[in-house]
């Protein structure tokens, strides 16, 4: 159906690929807010309209930020040909930002209960969305919100679904892991 991968070019620069061809992911961050329903779209047509407009404006992907949409949204992305970077919605503690420091070794610490909830919810999201080919990149942490044990989360995500790329914390603290 589709293959998402990465490959170094002749200059050593990592390029994202779709079906073994370089494919620059270009798209907006979409929080999925609706003026008359906050997180719930008023109609299926409204879901479709937003995705189609994104494509019409020249984008080829959407970073789904802070929420998981209903199944119809992903079905529309599949049909229209929009890739999705799916974030894990915010969780636990406020972000701890490591400004201009790509890895200090410091990360948030969660309670055992919070860790278990995170892991269950992330697995449930991945299971729910697994069959949608539009999902190209899993993002275990939205920015730095609740970011903890980043390398373990990225490795688990990659092992659980090796058919997709992993961006450990899109817009968050960089760690030496993921794709």
Language model regions located:
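Substrate-binding/catalytic cleft of secreted carbohydrate-active enzymes
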Residues: 61-179
């Amino acid at each position: 159906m589709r293959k998402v991968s990465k490959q170094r070019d002749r200059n050593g620069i990592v390029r994202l690929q779709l079906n073994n061809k370089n494919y620059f992911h270009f798209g907006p961050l979409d929080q999925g807010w609706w003026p008359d329903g906050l997180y719930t779209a008023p109609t299926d047509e409204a879901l479709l309209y937003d995705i189609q407009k994104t494509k019409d404006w020249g984008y080829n992907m959407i970073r789904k930020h802070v929420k998981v949409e209903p199944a119809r949204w992903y079905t529309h992305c599949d049909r229209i040909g929009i890739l999705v970077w799916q974030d894990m919605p915010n969780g636990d503690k406020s972000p701890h930002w490591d400004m201009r420091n790509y890895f200090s070794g410091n990360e948030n610490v969660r309670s055992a209960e919070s860790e278990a909830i995170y892991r269950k919810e992330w697995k449930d999201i991945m299971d729910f969305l697994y069959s949608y080919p539009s999902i190209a990149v899993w993002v275990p942490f939205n920015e730095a919100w609740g970011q903890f044990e980043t390398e373990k989360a990225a490795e688990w995500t990659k092992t659980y679904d090796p058919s997709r790329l992993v961006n450990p914390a899109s817009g968050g603290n960089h760690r030496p892991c993921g794709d």
